[in-house]
Regions:
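Residue-level marker of alpha-helix boundaries and capping positions
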Residues: 27, 78, 128-130
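Short, strongly hydrophobic transmembrane alpha-helices
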Residues: 12-41, 50
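Alpha-helical scaffold elements within enzyme catalytic domains, especially in hydrolases
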Residues: 8, 90-91, 141
Length: 231
């Protein structure tokens, strides 16, 4: 029986060769064209990890010295910070606004900037490349964004926590890759830079999130800004 099949295939080898070539060509086209489309579609359908549907970003700017209404006496750092917080409170008092939080720096969810670092789990030698986001404590940052709760403290508790220098909050996927657990509370990360070693206690975690809507979730660390640099 197999000999008969082989004879038939051999007798039609030219026709079967074309069929095989067409099959290979279709497979290559499918792999080159369809595979990236499937991957991109899958990545876009992964939840962001925060409530983007109800968020609105308001950009603020400063008057130039030659602009009408410019007040040179209001340019000292203390006044600038006070005015900034007053604007945030002003926005929060609008009808229909549930919460507002200041966003400083160039790296925040779906921003055009990025900030990367390498962290180690204490006692480990394998580095993890991680995105870094700065935030201001006691400004409803985590609950305003609507981040999903992780193990331990809620987003509201993380917003109002009394942070010490070097404290950080991790996404759960960052905690898993560093410590092999989603509950990293009480553990410490290590940052090494030019021979200096910095220990960073983990205060809590939030659910995995997408830094950019086209990306898959990546490890993210949130660093509290205990002072504001107005320079």
């Amino acid at each position: 029986m197999f000999k008969l099949i082989w004879k038939n295939l051999w007798a039609r080898r030219r026709k079967n060769g074309w069929l095989l070539a067409e099959l290979i060509l279709v497979s290559i086209i499918s792999w080159v064209v369809l595979d990236p489309v499937i991957v991109v579609t899958h990545d876009r359908n992964i939840p962001l990890g925060y409530d983007a549907e109800r968020l609105c970003l308001i950009s603020l700017g400063a008057l130039q010295p030659q602009a009408p209404g410019y007040d040179a006496e209001a340019q000292d750092s203390a006044t600038l910070v006070d005015n900034y917080y007053n604007l945030v409170r002003y926005v929060k008092d609008f009808d229909g606004v549930e919460s507002a939080t200041p966003v400083l720096g160039f790296c925040y969810p779906n921003s055009s900037g990025s900030s990367n670092s390498q962290l180690f789990a204490e006692g480990d030698t394998i580095p993890l490349s991680i995105m870094m986001i700065q935030f201001l404590p006691h400004t409803n940052f985590f609950d305003t964004y609507g981040f999903r709760s992780g193990k331990g403290r809620t987003p509201g508790q993380l917003s109002d926590y009394a942070y010490a220098p070097n404290d950080i909050v991790l996404t759960e996927n960052a905690a898993e890759q560093l410590f092999h657990t989603k509950d990293a509370h009480g553990k410490r990360c290590v940052s090494r830079d030019h021979g200096d070693t910095l220990y960073m206690p983990v205060v809590g975690t939030i659910g995995a999130m997408k830094m950019y809507s086209e990306w898959r979730p990546v490890p993210v660390a949130f660093m509290p800004m205990l002072t504001i640099d107005t320079s």
